[in-house]
UniProtKB/Swiss-Prot annotation:
This is ATP-dependent rRNA helicase RRP3. Residues 98-270 form the Helicase ATP-binding domain. Belongs to the DEAD box helicase family. DDX47/RRP3 subfamily. Its main location: nucleus.
Amino acid sequence: MAKIEKKQAVKNNQVLSLAEKIKRKALEKQQQAHANEPSPSDEDSAQSNSKDSNSNEQPEESEEIFESFTELDLVPELIEACKNLNYNKPTPIQSKAIPPALKGSDIIGLAQTGSGKTAAFAIPILNQLWHDQQPYYACILAPTRELAQQIKETFDSLGSLMGVRSTCIVGGMSMMDQARDLMRKPHIIIATPGRLMDHLENTKGFNLRKLKYLVMDEADRLLDMEFGPVLDRILNIIPTQGRTTYLFSATMTSKIDKLQRASLTNPVKCAVSNKYQTVDTLVQTLMVVPGGLKNTFLIYLLNEFIGKSTIVFTRTKANAERISNLCNLLEFSATALHGDLNQNQRTGALDLFKAGKRSILVATDVAARGLDIPSVDIVINYDIPVDSKSYIHRVGRTARAGRSGKSISLVSQYDLELILRIEDVLGKKLPKENVDKDAILALRDSVDKANGEVVMELNRRNKEKQARGKGRRGRMATRDNMDREER
């Protein structure tokens, strides 16, 4: 027993030794980084700078571009809210979508994330709500809980001077609490499709018979996540007469075209970008990683970019949890975001990262689209995504609203075909990142030992969890299972 404890103490000392070395080097880099860094600005401040607001998409010359929100014939309370939020100049998608929306047209909005599309549909809805206030006025469908919460925050901010009441109806939260919120007759409902369907079928006194606006945000992802059947049921329940519908998507696919034909009437198409692209301010590189060295390469990179706001993307929830724990064991400041966390844990992780209390977010693709995460400096693809769309959305977390950013992809021999497809979509070869191979190899033994400790601890937790979960397998699953981000 004493030998085992002594051996464990030696392993722990080796891990701590690596952490101390990293910490000493990190302190120097962090001081230098903070001395040279400009102060970060919120992503929404892009609306106050004309150069920033036009950085991601180029408007068509035939379309009118507005210089301020006062030109859009909005109610004074909404204009004042825009000023308070530093929304001084409409972004291209807002300039294109808001005028026809104010005239009552159905809208198809095609724009990338970070383009201001949430405000593009929130502003016309709130403007009309001011003239015709009634409960259950608008319903916004979103593919993820995090995006739904973000949309709610936008409505609350823009409607702050108008007495707007909103609620967020998503899986992973109490049905009873949500039912009580719905009974308070909010004006705006933001929901994931599965949970909305639960309430339409099971919550007494709740219906959307008088709904005036329906919005499907990130519609391409709604369909990718197999929400199609639930969307069909929702569309069959809510009224078509007297309803205005907005559909926003990053791309126009055959599925999106079928959905818009079934749900929209003579829509106005407002396209800012209809192809996948990355911004010029994003530097994209790759690192060819020999077998068994991916963890070591990652720790090397995190040490090189210490003090920078970094998102590490993984393909699986297990990897996200493991890498987050590995980073923390080596005294990096990390938190995880994935679908196995409950809603409070996910919100807490995002809040820690956005507030700068954690510099590293280790996430699955749940964080790749739609989330408002300001000032991300570095994106690292620990696992290469299986499709080019996911790559574009991942690296799009950085270099937003005119800022510079960097993405680095760790490429193994099994990823070569995937990276070739990505390069084909980008229309260019990704250069290799310059690395100090000797420094990487010097970290290998210590990183492997630390990873072994993490794997043992996670296995122990999983066994405890399985023991607690015995006897529950026979229970019927609810539609909460549809409000998931990883399949």
